[in-house]
């Protein structure tokens, strides 16, 4: 991933995205002894950073005249599917989205609202991805991965570019990891524009495919467990393009517990008035749970999404 790819992505998607706020968290700063700032991708269209990559992927393919673009298909835990459904609707392309059966209803409703064909009956994300790829082979549809796609990664990385434009002195970037698309792009930007910024990736304890794989020196399959951060679960594609940049560019990988996630999600709401879903609270959870040493540093933390069902949020805040 070149910085030029990210700059081109930003120009390409500019009419369709919003520049999201980058705000200081007094709560996390006081708690950690650092200057902690939140990149609120939770306020992006569709309330997720996934909007950026989805629009870049579709527009870039239209620019290149990609064959088989008459129909799109994807797999998603919810947010990518919602964003890609909006992009497909914008450009008049039919889309089929495969999701786990237990994906949050707020995400499923939004996917259907944009006119995509929704197949929400997979056992888990891994099965949804296998079925989406089989559908692509059977129908000739163009499969757009939510993470292992250069255009998706470049689009997501535009959020990191905004961070360094707002705060060039950022010396620690904390990023959640699901399939690795966001952190691959964000780390590429960080290393291209800064000589001092370290990058930390955050997974959940019950689904830490990349930490396990980096330690093994190769991609290994894990058995993911259920988590509040449903958007971060599952195994990456064995051929994912995100593993190599994570190995090369990410300085540290950490995991957070379910309690860390709950504490971060509740704290964001009560102290910072920021709503986040479980996956969206994973990076703040690493600060809350003291999984990384941030004392005295200028820290940028992604709040990557806010698509949480009302009942679940109410239960956490009760």
Label each residue range with its predicted role.
Residues 1-318:
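PLP-dependent amino-acid enzyme catalytic core
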């Amino acid at each position: 991933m070149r910085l030029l790819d990210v700059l081109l992505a930003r120009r390409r998607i500019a009419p369709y995205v919003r520049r999201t706020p980058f705000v200081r968290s007094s709560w996390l700063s006081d708690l950690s002894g650092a200057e902690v700032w939140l990149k609120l991708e939770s306020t992006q269209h569709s309330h997720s950073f996934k909007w950026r990559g989805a629009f870049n992927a579709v527009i870039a393919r239209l620019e290149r005249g990609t064959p088989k673009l008459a129909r799109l298909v994807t797999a998603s835990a919810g947010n990518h599917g919602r964003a890609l459904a909006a992009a497909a609707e914008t450009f008049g392309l039919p889309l089929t989205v495969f999701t786990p059966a237990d994906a949050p209803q707020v995400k499923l409703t939004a996917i259907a609202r944009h006119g995509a064909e929704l197949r929400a009956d997979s056992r888990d994300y891994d099965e949804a991805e296998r079925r989406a790829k089989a559908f692509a082979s059977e129908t000739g549809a163009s499969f757009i991965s939510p993470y292992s796609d250069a255009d998706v990664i470049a689009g997501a990385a535009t959020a990191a570019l905004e961070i360094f434009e707002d705060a060039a002195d950022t010396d620690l970037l904390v990023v959640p990891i699901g399939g690795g698309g966001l952190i691959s792009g964000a780390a590429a930007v960080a290393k291209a524009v800064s000589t001092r910024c370290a990058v930390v990736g955050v997974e959940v304890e019950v689904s830490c495919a990349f930490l396990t794989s980096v330690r093994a020196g190769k991609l290994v399959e894990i058995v993911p467990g259920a988590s509040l951060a449903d958007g971060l679960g599952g195994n990456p594609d064995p051929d994912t393009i995100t593993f190599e940049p994570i190995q090369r560019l990410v300085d540290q990988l950490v995991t957070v517990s379910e309690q860390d996630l709950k504490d971060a999600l509740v704290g964001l709401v009560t102290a910072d008035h920021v709503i986040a879903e479980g996956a969206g609270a994973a990076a703040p959870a690493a600060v809350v749970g003291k999984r990384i040493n941030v004392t005295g540093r200028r820290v940028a933390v992604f709040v990557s999404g806010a698509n949480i069902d009302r009942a679940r949020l109410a239960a956490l805040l009760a």
